Amino acid sequence: MGFRGVFILLSVSMITMYSCVLGRDTAKSGISEINFGSGGGVTGRVVMYRLRPNGTVYNDNNELVTKLTKKETAHLFGKLSKYADYSYDNPSNMSCFIVITSKRKENRIVWAVMGDPHIDSEVVELYERFMSKIDTK
């Protein structure tokens, strides 16, 4: 099973597991959560973090990793709300992804880790901004 298969399986599992605990949509953005992650390569390992509207960040084991400030959370939710319908699916051996979930749909944005010239640069900047807030030790 390739990265795409693992990613789809992981996404479906996460949605199923957390569907009962999803909070209300953020009033301004309409987004209920944002997942940021990367994976692939020889091992196929996928690392994912889930950002909730209250700023809490959980890893894929549902362990609390950190809590972002209200300002940072509002910035990420606000900026990423305009990408709720952005279509980009270009995985490679190693890929990054953002999954934007709202009441009405889920949108996956997937791009190559090693510089994808066609992805909207703001998406990559927002991904990097979020990941810089995570203590990955």
Model-derived features: where do they sit?
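Short, well-ordered strand-loop elements centered on a beta-strand within folded domains, enriched
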Residues: 55-62, 105-111
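Well-ordered beta-strand positions in beta-sheet-rich domains
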Residues: 46-48, 65, 108-109
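Sec-dependent bacterial lipoprotein signal peptides
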Residues: 1-20
